[in-house]
Amino acid sequence: MSQTTPAATDRLAQLPLPPGPRVPGVVQTALFSHRDRITPWLRKHYGDVIAVSVLGRPSVLVCSPELNRSVLSGEPTTFHAGEGRIQGIRNVMGEGSVVTTDEAAHQRLRKLLVPPFNGAALRGYRDMMKELAAREIGRWPVGTPFAAQPRMNAVTLEMMLRVVLGLREGPQLDALRVPFSRLVSASMAVYAGEVVPQLQRFGPWKRFRQLRERIDDALYAEIRERRSAGTTADRGDVLSQLIATQVDGDRLSDAELRDQMVTLLLAGHETTAITLSWTLHDLAHDQALQDKAIAAVDTGDDKYFEAVIKESMRLHPVFYAVARRLTHDIELGGYRVPAGYTVFAGIGPVQSDPGQHADPHAFRPERFFDGSATAWNWLPFGAGVRRCLGGGFAMMESTAILREVLLNYRLSPGRSRPETARARHVVYIPSHGARIIAHRRAK
């Protein structure tokens, strides 16, 4: 929270800056790209508040639940989440996205986005999710190794197009399936080109701009058609509900609808696919755990089944940290962090901390029944006023897909050794795509 009184300002000015490694910024950025491996060493040497330089930004990584609470539940006028995002990704999502805006603009969008993600709306998506999951999983190869992640990418993309955008079989769906897939899989170098307009006339940056234009044209055409037809109230998809939503006479513009759709794709499609890929990988490598998960599916034990997915999210966080850009100087853990710094609330460090989770590297869903997993040491959807609105959607989607897998298959490893995490952009994925072998279950 910002400090305003003269005495508080004087006290804050006397606090030291956080400690951190004394190496060139380019080296720190390179090290931070392997933050899951370097953070334990940094914590050992510098504590839970660590100064780092990331992409030329002076930054701080915090590594305890208490400090994460200070950051994630801090005053929204001081901790800017939208401004903390990488500019290239901000440009693609749009300036009217719920994740790129801050303060009053964010609060307005959040109110308008609630209806499609409340409990009643989520229940309406269940049958479509089950149908899409069964269709994709029915095409899996049997008895031969394959990478689970591309398969999970395919089914979660189809859910985004059908459940979120509400596209039906036909030219609109065909026009967006491949472009959206390419948008998600584009390299960080291509996204970085979004902040250098001159690059967009050449090579991959030009193709990426053209790709975005095709997506935008298709989305705007779909939005205009829905508005003119006036049939959104009869459809159950997220886009139609957002078009129909009004709060105190306020509604989303076409540009804002476009920004939310692209944001939901980028923020919700690959993240769910990665979580499911890790879950399948871990079940394949632990037959006793898989037996329990299959029993939970067969007996309808939804609590244990959901705990399996939550434990996968804890053990393999897709995002290692979430960023906030400071608008005021703050005190954090006895240190002064100046305005303009980016503060990273560490999800990975807390979720793998033995002080928070007993035997943290073991896959143990039971920890979600003994009270050890809390709102501040299990953070896959963030926390505070910026907690992910789509968290319930992601959990329902994940359970629908995993349930179809385990109803139909037993899994075994596609490689002799478990896979490690590999950084791709800002997410962590299985190093070999989560290779598994599917064996049909006896009915």
Which residues are covered by each model-predicted region?
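Cytochrome P450 proximal C-terminal region
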Residues: 3-4, 12-18, 43-44, 133, ...
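Cytochrome P450 I-helix active-site segment
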Residues: 17-20, 25, 126, 130, ...
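N-terminal membrane-proximal hinge/A-helix region immediately C-terminal to the signal-anchor transmembrane segment
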Residues: 2-95, 99-108, 123, 127-135, ...
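Cytochrome P450 catalytic-core helices
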Residues: 156, 269-290, 294-296, 392-409
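Conserved cytochrome P450 K-helix E-x-x-R motif and the immediately C-terminal K′/meander segment
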Residues: 26-47, 221, 299-333, 354
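Conserved cytochrome P450 K-helix/beta-meander segment immediately N-terminal to the heme-binding cysteine loop
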Residues: 345-372
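Cytochrome P450 heme-thiolate monooxygenase catalytic core
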Residues: 2-15, 79-90, 105-108, 121-274
